[in-house]
Amino acid sequence: MKSILLIGLGRFGKHIALELNRMGHEVMAVDTVEDRVEALLPFVTNAQIGDSTNEDFLKSLGIRNYDVCIVAIGSDFQSSLETTSLLKELGAKKVVSRAARDVQAKFLLRNGADEVVYPERMLAKWTALRCP
């Protein structure tokens, strides 16, 4: 079982939280939208409403205590980039960040991401492989 910090609880982040819960991991879920946080409370170990671009807020989460930090913010690349950078500065062991385009991935990797995922590309490939 791993301890995972998940930031961003939109469609992608919500499904990550549910899958991590199914796998038995401890998940701390964070979003700025109260309804998203409340909807996932039954499925995560803990959840907080907060701004992940705020260094003091991130410090309060105890970043070094997590095995993996996932940045699943999809609608605001600037926030994703700032969050990724702050996580690494605060001692995150591993940061996995979401990107939609190659240029975003380059910025994320240069600013602290250990890995970048492309949800839309990954799903498109998975779907295409299932076509006869």
Residues of each region from the PLM?
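Cytosolic regulatory regions of ion transport systems
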Residues: M1-P132
